[in-house]
Curated annotation (Swiss-Prot):
PROSITE patterns: HTH_DEOR_1 (PS00894), HTH_DEOR_2 (PS51000). GO terms for biological process: regulation of DNA-templated transcription. SUPFAM superfamilies: NagB/RpiA/CoA transferase-like, Winged helix' DNA-binding domain. Keywords: DNA-binding, Repressor, Transcription, Transcription regulation. Gene3D superfamilies: 3.40.50.1360, Winged helix-like DNA-binding domain superfamily/Winged helix DNA-binding domain. The keyword Repressor applies. This is Uncharacterized HTH-type transcriptional regulator YulB. InterPro entries: Carb_Metab_HTH_regulators (IPR050313), DeoR-like_C (IPR014036), DeoR_HTH (IPR001034), NagB/RpiA_transferase-like (IPR037171), Tscrpt_reg_HTH_DeoR_CS (IPR018356), WH-like_DNA-bd_sf (IPR036388), WH_DNA-bd_sf (IPR036390). Residues 20-39 bind DNA. GO terms for molecular function: cis-regulatory region sequence-specific DNA binding; ligand-modulated transcription factor activity. It comes from Bacillus subtilis (strain 168). Signal peptide: none annotated.
Length: 258
């Protein structure tokens, strides 16, 4: 990796994390701590970050990550209905990926205790699945994003290169026919792209409120999706537009269950 590229990545990491220690950056980039200190000194002079005792802090206010506790209470009925439908596509012996969405967490909660291998970047999903003795759980590791209680970044992306799975179950912040799937967080988008690449099938779990939204970071085309599971709030014209593009759509009816 070129010096300029490493320094750009350092800025991205610091902005994502708000703060980080020199030792962590040294591990991420496999260079000495002295090299990282020189990088931070240069970046501070360029007004791209601020050095602190033992590390660096962001000079930006970044709000692309919504706190998990807030997402957990948003569109709960829709997300639970979608999660229940998605769980039907999992069978014993599968190797699957779950992203760090609240819908994937709801899915983790209801997955039967059968022979499965689950790779996830979600702390919540990993903890939930750890209670099921027949399910093997692999965490991607990486940089912890405190608001979403998930891992992302270069280490998380590299960890996926080791694996191949049958199915990936993920969500997004926005999707439409022309622009595909998108996310407000660049690192989450990059990791989801890697998840799709490592999987035979990708099942998108997205409630109807996300239809038509176009967020900052592109994930992938809807042509990369094997099936979209959404809720019955998605209007028939939109369903037809998706099906015209050869996207298989399952729109689950909504009940009063919470």
């Amino acid at each position: 990796m070129l010096v300029a590229e490493r320094q750009q990545k350092i800025v991205e990491i610091v902005n994502m994390r708000s703060s980080i220690r020199v030792s962590e950056l040294s591990d991420i980039f496999s260079v000495t701590e002295e090299t990282i200190r020189r990088d931070l000194e240069k970046l501070e002079k360029e007004h791209k970050l601020s050095r602190s005792h033992g590390g660096a802090v962001s000079i930006q206010q970044k709000e692309s990550e919504i706190h998990f506790s807030e997402r957990e209470i948003t569109n709960v009925i829709e997300k639970k209905a979608i999660a229940h439908e998605a769980a039907k596509y999992v069978k014993s012996g599968d190797r699957i990926i779950l992203d760090a969405s609240t819908t994937a967490w709801y899915m983790a909660k209801i997955l039967p205790d059968i022979e499965l291998t689950v790779i996830t970047n979600s702390m919540k999903a990993a903890i939930e699945l750890s209670n099921k003795e027949n399910i093997s759980v692999i965490s991607t590791g990486g940089i912890l994003l405190e608001k979403s209680l998930s891992f992302a970044g270069p280490l998380a992306e590299r960890s996926l290169e080791t694996y191949h799975v049958n199915k990936t179950f993920l969500s997004c912040k926005g999707f439409d026919v022309h622009n595909g799937m998108s996310d407000s967080n660049e690192w989450q988008a990059l990791l989801k792209k890697r998840m799709i690449e490592r999987s035979d099938q990708t099942i998108l779990m997205a409630d109807s409120s996300k239809w038509g939204n176009r967020e900052f970071s592109h994930i992938a085309s809807l042509q990369d999706v094997s099936r979209l599971i959404t809720d019955s709030g998605l209007d028939p014209a939109s369903v037809k537009a998706l099906e015209d593009k050869k996207v298989k759509v399952t729109a689950v009816p909504l009940s009063k269950r919470g």
